[in-house]
Amino acid sequence: MTAQTQCQDSQVLLTMTNVCKSFPGVKALDNANLTVRSHSVHALMGENGAGKSTLLKCLFGIYAKDEGEILFLGEPVNFKTSKEALENGISMVHQELNLVRQTSVMDNLWLGRYPLKGPFVDHAKMYRDTKAIFDELDIDVDPKEKVAKLSVSQMQMIEIAKAFSYNAKIVIMDEPTSSLSEKEVEHLFKIIDKLKQRGCGIIYISHKMDEIFKICDEITILRDGKWINTVNVKESTMEQIVGMMVGRELTQRFPEKTNVPKEVILQVENLTAKNQPSIQDVSFELRKGEILGIAGLVGAKRTDIVEAIFGVRELIEGTIKLHGKTVKNHTALEAINNGFALVTEERRSTGIYSNLSIEFNSLISNMKSYLTPWKLLSTKKMKSDTQWVIDSMNVKTPSHRTTIGSLSGGNQQKVIIGRWLLTQPEILMLDEPTRGIDIGAKFEIYQLIQELAKKDKGIIMISSEMPELLGVTDRILVMSNGKLAGIVESAKTSQEEILQLAAKYL
């Protein structure tokens, strides 16, 4: 049975009609609609701020809707809490995993509803029931293991197993593959297929178009809180979906590469990190105006390269030369003073102070430059530089005093890049710069990277998205298990060649 036929034959599980929700000064949802069927995966798409999360929070009992109707299994519902939604068969696998890390896997699975034997918890039954679910979903984790010892992908599987244990009819997945390797993604897709076969309806949120077209049956697009369209995946193109998301035709996914790299600016020779497993004997060159991508599977130690260059990972061997002169970056401060900048992978945990202002987050890497001879801060220069970040990075914000945590992922990333540009770096290193960013904002980040290359910055860009590396970079350095597997020209290589190199030392 094809996905299309299956979707047509399946039962309607959920209907959300004309749902409205307002916050002070903002109409987050304006007559939004969503219909989810059994035996199907339904993508909910839209740029950051389109209303996707708000709509699902109204369903899940986190927010109360202002207007509209929600029908679940044909009956009107208005859940007051997420616990009520769970008990009625609606489960959410959050992007920020919601597990108690210091307890066991099976404790997390049955938290608040332990099986009892008289007045005591029946641990034997809890173990058996957990193992039965894991066997059905092909999850290879010991139910007695502490959650803190699991990988991110294993934690994600536990969240899905928890939904399974509630006998959920609707399972909501928010960016479930953002931290997974290709192998782990394939395992997740197999579990999603099992949920479909069981009769579940899966609501799938992702910015990764390739995934949407691989596993989803239908797509609902929201823009500015409004329902735009619901389409069948088999009858749609990527360009049509993107056009509906952004409200305009996006004629190209990546900006045209017009810059020609110049002379060598950075030489990295025989880098080997102190604490193994890590990078071993890595050498490469970077030219002025060049965008060098770094590819590899999860665990390939891509991030270790930029951390070693930036002075936050100790080396036992290796030389770094800038303009032919050896530089020693023992700390991040030394690296900044030597002309290096690093936009880290985990934006929320290591890139921003989410409860503080855009101004603070724009200036924090360069505070020394705002000191007057009397050791006071020059508020005039601080305000001027913050405004430069907002204007030059095209940050959408009502004020420089707005907390950065209230901005979309794309705007947060622009502030971070702007912050580093204030330090006037010659080498800009970007680790997963578009992770968790919608497709319209991604294009703006790509344009920004191209503009910086035109200004003769040397740029190193790590990404797990192969089309992104091929579309944005000039050359791609491929890592495999901490070793350099090869360097290829982006215009002359393929995903297949890169994957072969990535597996070279496994």
Curated annotation (Swiss-Prot):
It catalyses: D-galactose(out) + ATP + H2O = D-galactose(in) + ADP + phosphate + H(+); methyl beta-D-galactoside(out) + ATP + H2O = methyl beta-D-galactoside(in) + ADP + phosphate + H(+). It is found in: Cell inner membrane. Residues 14-249, 260-506 form the ABC transporter domain. GO terms for molecular function: ATP binding; ATP hydrolysis activity. It is an enzyme of class 7 (translocase). NCBIfam families: PRK10982.1 (NF008215). Part of the ABC transporter complex MglABC involved in galactose/methyl galactoside import. Responsible for energy coupling to the transport system. Belongs to the ABC transporter superfamily. Galactose/methyl galactoside importer (TC 3.A.1.2.3) family. This is Galactose/methyl galactoside import ATP-binding protein MglA. It comes from Haemophilus influenzae (strain ATCC 51907 / DSM 11121 / KW20 / Rd).
